[in-house]
Design a protein with these regions (language model features):
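C-terminal catalytic lobe of FAD-dependent flavoproteins
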Residues: 147, 226-233, 239-241, 245, ...
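Flavin (FAD/FMN) cofactor-binding and adjacent substrate-gating region
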Residues: 92-162, 166-167, 173-184, 262, ...
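Beta1/beta-strand and adjacent pyrophosphate-binding region of the FAD-binding site
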Residues: 2-16
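Glycine-rich FAD pyrophosphate-binding loop
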Residues: 25-45
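Core beta-strand elements of the Rossmann-like FAD/NAD(P) dinucleotide-binding domain
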Residues: 4-6, 195-205
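Flavin (primarily FAD) binding-site architecture
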Residues: 208-222
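Short hydrophobic core segments
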Residues: 11, 201-211
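Dinucleotide-binding Rossmann-like beta1-alpha1 core, especially the glycine-rich loop
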Residues: 48-122, 126
Length: 570
């Protein structure tokens, strides 16, 4: 069995895990991160994309609010290009009257969240679709963040600092030495899902940052970490109905936020306790509830087109919590299992929000320094990730580049303005096993057609690249995790001639029929809960192309399965 030796092993490829790898690598530690699927597959890739100002929690959870506003300011410097500076409104609807707005304003001032009351007329001028019956509006520095890009950019920064990032490597066991009362975790046994090979990763310290799966990882060492999985459903509208984050000015509840995100608006969210963190299905009642509540913020939204529904599972934690997940703190917890359970060599970090991932990573690596006997200061608060120099994201950047450089003929995905060069360079730069990986890299298939057209083109491009790859180009050695300008059509077109070699996976996972089947099945899961009106007609059209025109469900795939086939089909 192959063996890898390192100082710190990080389990989990979400925002927190990647942040830990970045922080630890910058402090000079040897770091290996393992993630059982692609980066951001879990909670980080399934939230509403809100960069919290802290306003949502100033009354109910002031500790979390204080952490959010402090990290908000830092991330605007370190991950600038991943953030759209939308600002945020907290609005008082006719159903929200009472003393909460005054308590909200006072709490913002006490905690240090910048907040000012703006005239309703001014708010309606900036957001014409906002409910005209709102009585008060407060402005806070919320923002919209691309969690996929931010996490991949952080991974790139970690790799440049010396870390090793292994996606599609699932932990199948923890390596534990010693007897009862004197046990130590010395690493993990992981399985490469692309080829089936098992690898032992030996480390002086293992950090469990698996989010909603952290309890499952802890059980591999015979430990109990009571994770409270709180499922939140979300909806993507087919266009940006608002350009400012809109919150209900009330205690956090279901369906009380709308976030502009790239070309769409995200309506969220619900909060229901589930037993299994893999439960991502969205129920019809959740869709109805979200639309009905959002209609109180933007009247008429119930008649707008919804292109997709999805859910994420929050990794909430309280040692003795038994009530509703809405009542669980959004602050994070760092567990030292040596002090807590008598098992050395293992830390678990859980809870928190995406906005606080950098702070969570800092505290985890501080504890790692303490246990490994090294005093190395954290520098992530002042170290921008690659791409931050471009400044804030703005919605029209892709259209501007496509038009300025006459790239219309190169478009693979018209909805999200993804060009052929972008697809080719994404495949070369990152360890993509599926088209779903390209969705996270490029927003491929995220528009109203949900991959109805671009899927075939992208699958063909990947197949073509694989056919022209030489044996010496295969493997993971060529993966560079270079993402800082991956979403810029003009840059990718200019760099296409000097692109890196293609590194297909070490098996037939790029079979085009397999790529097609898996990706369209993944898109179908998100479309099923919102099949009515225009989206029903769109999906019927996509189905006719796939089944009737292409006869794609009968194309031979040699019985192949990808690491994601079972998940997509569930």
């Amino acid at each position: 069995m192959r063996r890898i030796d390192t100082e710190i092993l990080v389990i989990g490829g979400g925002g927190t895990g990647v942040g830990i790898a970045w922080d630890a690598a910058l402090r000079g530690f040897g770091v290996v991160l393992v993630e059982k699927r692609d980066l951001t597959h879990g909670t980080t890739g399934r939230f509403h994309g809100l960069l919290h100002s802290g306003g949502r929690y100033v009354v109910k959870d002031p500790q979390s609010a204080a952490e959010c506003i402090a990290e908000n300011r830092i991330l605007r410097r370190t991950h600038t290009h991943c953030i759209e500076d939308t600002g945020g409104f907290f609005v008082v609807t006719p159903e929200d009257e009472g003393d909460y707005p005054d308590r909200f304003l006072a709490a913002c001032r006490q905690i240090g969240v910048p907040c000012q009351e703006v005239p309703v007329a001014e708010a309606l001028r900036r957001e014409p679709l906002l409910n005209p019956r709102v009585s008060r509006v407060f402005e806070v520095p919320d923002g919209s963040v691309d969690g996929f890009l931010a996490t991949h950019a952080t991974a790139q920064a970690a790799v440049r600092a010396g870390a090793q990032v292994l996606t599609y490597h699932e932990v199948v066991g923890l390596l534990v030495e010693g007897s009862e009362g004197d046990r130590r975790v010395v690493g993990a046994r992981v399985r490469d899902l692309a080829c089936g090979e098992e690898v032992e990763v030996h480390a002086a310290l293992t950090i469990n940052a698996a989010g909603a799966w952290a309890g499952q990882i802890a059980r591999l060492a015979g430990l109990t970490v009571q994770v409270i999985p709180g499922k939140g459903a979300l909806l993507a509208m087919n266009h940006r109905i608002v350009n400012t984050v809109i919150n209900r000015c009330r205690m956090p509840s279901d369906g009380d936020i709308i976030v502009p995100a790239h070309t769409v608006a995200v309506v969220g969210t619900t909060d229901r306790r589930v037993n299994d963190p893999e439960v991502f299905s969205v129920e019809p009642w959740e869709v109805r509830l979200l639309l009905e509540e959002a209609d109180k913020l933007v009247p008429g939204i119930t008649g707008a087109r919804v292109v997709r529904a999805w859910a994420g599972v929050r990794p909430l934690y309280e040692e003795h919590q038994t009530g509703a997940t809405r009542d669980t703190t959004r602050a994070f917890t760092l567990l030292d299992h040596r002090a807590r359970d008598g098992v050395a060599g293992l830390l678990t970090i859980i809870g928190g929000k995406w906005t606080t991932f950098r702070l969570m990573a800092e505290k985890a690596v501080d504890k790692a320094c303490e246990q490994l006997g090294a005093r190395k200061p954290c520098t992530t608060a002042t170290t921008p990730v690659p791409g931050a120099e471009r400044g804030y994201y703005w919605l029209g950047h892709r259209l501007h580049e496509v038009e300025e450089h006459h790239l219309q003929g190169e478009l693979v995905c018209e909805c999200e303005l993804v060009t052929r060069a972008m697809v080719e360079n994404a495949v070369r730069a990152n360890p993509a096993l599926t088209l779903d990986d390209l969705r996270r890299d490029l927003r491929l298939g995220k528009g109203p057609c949900q991959g109805g057209f671009c899927t075939y083109r992208a699958a063909g491009i990947m197949h073509e690249l694989a056919c022209h790859a030489t044996p010496s180009q295969a493997g993971q050695e060529g993966r560079r995790w270079e993402v800082e300008r991956l979403e810029c059509p003009a840059d990718q077109a200019a760099g296409a001639g000097s692109a890196a070699p293609v590194c297909p996976p070490p098996s037939d996972l790029w079979n085009p029929n397999l790529l097609l089947r898996d990706f369209l099945q993944e898109r179908w899961k998100g479309a099923m809960p919102v099949l009515w009106g225009d989206q029903m007609r769109q999906e019927r059209f996509d189905e006719l192309i796939y089944l009737s025109l292409m006869n794609a469900d009968h194309l031979p795939d040699e019985g192949l399965c990808s690491p994601m086939t079972g998940f997509y089909g569930a």
